[in-house]
């Protein structure tokens, strides 16, 4: 996508030459637009192509790709400009307006032609060959705050996707993205900083060399265990799940049976066992010692073909346990696992603490009759929402658009029974993201119907219907959502957390860090 914006920042009075000089310092600082942009994608962030001052107006031409879109970029300029000139020059910002905004989406000609006649509220749609142009005119600060631009883009992209949608959209009886419940915090939120930035500066976390990995120091580890215990006590134990220890190194054959390899093969870490040839490894070691670098090409020769993945969903071993077994749905099974990390390769999408490649979850998996499976899913979601209310955490629950077992798949050639709603996703509000109301997904409650039952040949001994379901409570994300709303001051935290944490441990002090 390409974004081309003509807009203006309107001040409370004419901008003096002295104030203009200070504003230019902000305009020339591109770091404002790079926050949250993945490494290597900086070229897709907002750029100021030209600017000029006209009395009270700062007139801007801006462009961008997908990251820090131009309409987000112009809004981001407000705060640093006010910090520069507000007090020193007694000038305020009265409004931010967009005179004209052209958003271009590239697609196949055949798909573009199918959008002919489509009406998008509050904007104009122009179709030109392989290009879809969404054109806004005279958009004010109020419309920006209502996210009409992002909604219009999502609307058009959804219309495109309908022509080639994931199986999720075909299966789901309620439109993905529909909010089914929400809760507004009773207290006033007074913390608006990025929890990742502050956690780093305080020394609660430190970036690990691997992409999307972090070292969690004692204060953060203490908070992890506090939330883990709370989720077990307030959610998992109330539904009487039994704890198991699930393997985290999953054979490729298991992933094949799950059909995970069809939907998201690019989202996993693949594991290659080494060849048992010590003399060949000695050559590798010798070369490394002499060259003082790791000879990757030689190492590749010493590895067998990929045979495993690191668990990307955490529930994989559950279905393997019942592979080609006869079960009794009158004796349903409810297991949970909290024994280790889950791994997903996010590539360039890994950012901050809320989207990582290595994360901790408490994973519940169950099997029984369709009615039982649906009731358990509803209970896991209910108790998660109850916990958020007890902690006075603002949240909403929506119909998910990416149940892990359907993600990326366009069709299923088997006679699979799917639930009306495969996935609900509960999100905690992130108040530091001001351009739009965003949340971090903390609980994912899924029903698979007969998807895994068919894949693993699981049958009821009376030939009755067997379904499965799973709910993941993402510890890493629960903590990010909590810190985003409460901040890092122990005294500001609710008693429910303090009673679990008791006393916060100290951070090891070094000369150079934190």
Curated annotation (Swiss-Prot):
L-serine binds at residues 313, 344, 361-363. InterPro entries: aa-tRNA-synt_IIb, aa-tRNA-synth_II/BPL/LPL, Ser-tRNA-ligase_2_arc, SerS_tRNA-bd. One of its GO terms (biological process) is seryl-tRNA aminoacylation. GO terms for cellular component: cytoplasm. Coiled coil: none annotated. GO terms for molecular function: ATP binding; serine-tRNA ligase activity; zinc ion binding. ATP binds at residues 344-346, 355-356, 477. Binds 1 Zn(2+) ion per subunit. This ion is coordinated with 2 cysteines, 1 glutamate and a water molecule that dissociates from the zinc ion to allow the coordination of the amino group of the serine substrate, which is essential for catalysis. Transmembrane segments: none annotated. It is an enzyme of class 6 (ligase). Consists of two distinct domains, a catalytic core and a N-terminal extension that is presumably involved in tRNA binding. Homodimer. This is Type-2 serine--tRNA ligase. The lineage of its organism: Archaea, Methanobacteriati, Methanobacteriota, Methanomada group, Methanococci.
């Amino acid at each position: 996508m390409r974004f081309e914006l003509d807009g203006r920042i309107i001040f409370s009075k004419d901008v003096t030459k002295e104030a203009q000089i200070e504003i230019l310092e902000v305009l020339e600082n591109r770091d404002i637009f790079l926050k949250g942009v993945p490494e290597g994608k900086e070229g897709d962030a907002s750029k100021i192509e030209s600017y000029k001052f006209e009395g009270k107006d700062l007139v801007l031409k801006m462009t961008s790709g997908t990251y820090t879109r131009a309409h987000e970029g112009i809004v981001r300029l407000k705060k640093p400009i006010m910090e520069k000139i507000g007090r020193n020059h007694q000038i305020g910002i009265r409004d931010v307006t967009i005179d004209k905004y052209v958003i271009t989406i590239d697609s196949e000609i055949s798909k573009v032609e199918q959008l002919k006649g489509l009406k998008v509220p509050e904007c104009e749609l122009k179709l030109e060959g392989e290009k879809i142009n969404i054109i806004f005119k005279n958009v004010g600060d109020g419309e920006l705050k209502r996210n009409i631009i992002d909604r219009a883009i999502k609307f058009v992209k959804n219309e495109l996707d309908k022509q080639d949608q994931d199986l999720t959209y075909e299966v789901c009886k309620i439109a993905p993205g529909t909010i089914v419940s929400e809760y507004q915090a009773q207290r006033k939120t007074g913390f608006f900083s990025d929890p990742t930035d502050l956690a780093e500066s305080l020394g609660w976390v430190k970036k690990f060399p691997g992409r999307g990995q972090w070292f969690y120091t004692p204060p953060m580890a203490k908070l992890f265990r506090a939330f883990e215990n709370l989720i077990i006590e307030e959610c998992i134990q109330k539904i009487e799940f039994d704890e198991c220890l699930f393997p985290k190194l999953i054979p490729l054959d298991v992933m094949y049976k799950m059909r995970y390899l069809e939907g998201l093969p690019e989202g996993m870490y693949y594991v290659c066992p080494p060849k048992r040839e010590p003399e060949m490894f000695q050559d590798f070691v010798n070369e490394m010692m002499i060259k003082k670098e790791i000879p990757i090409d030689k190492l590749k020769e010493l590895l067998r073909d990929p045979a495993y993945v690191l668990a990307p969903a955490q529930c994989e071993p559950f279905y393997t346990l019942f592979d080609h077994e006869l079960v009794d749905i009158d004796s349903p099974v409810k297991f949970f696992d909290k024994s280790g990390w889950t791994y997903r390769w996010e590539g360039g999408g890994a950012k901050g603490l809320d989207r990582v490649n290595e994360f901790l979850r408490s994973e519940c998996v169950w099997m029984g009759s369709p009615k039982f499976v649906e009731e358990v899913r509803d209970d896991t979601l209910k108790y998660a929402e109850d916990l958020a209310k007890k902690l006075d955490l603002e949240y909403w629950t929506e119909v998910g658009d990416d149940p892990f077992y359907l993600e990326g798949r366009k069709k299923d050639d088997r006679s699979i029974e799917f639930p009306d709603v495969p996935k609900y996703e509960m999100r905690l509000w992130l108040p530091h993201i001001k351009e739009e109301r965003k949340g971090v997904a903390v609980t994912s409650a899924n029903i698979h119907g007969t998807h895994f039952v068919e894949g693993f040949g699981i049958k009821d001994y009376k030939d009755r219907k067997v379904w499965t379901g799973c709910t993941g409570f993402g510890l890493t994300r629960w903590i990010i959502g909590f810190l985003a709303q409460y901040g890092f001051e122990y005294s500001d935290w609710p008693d429910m957390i303090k009673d679990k944490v008791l006393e916060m441990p100290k951070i090891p002090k070094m000369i150079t860090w934190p």
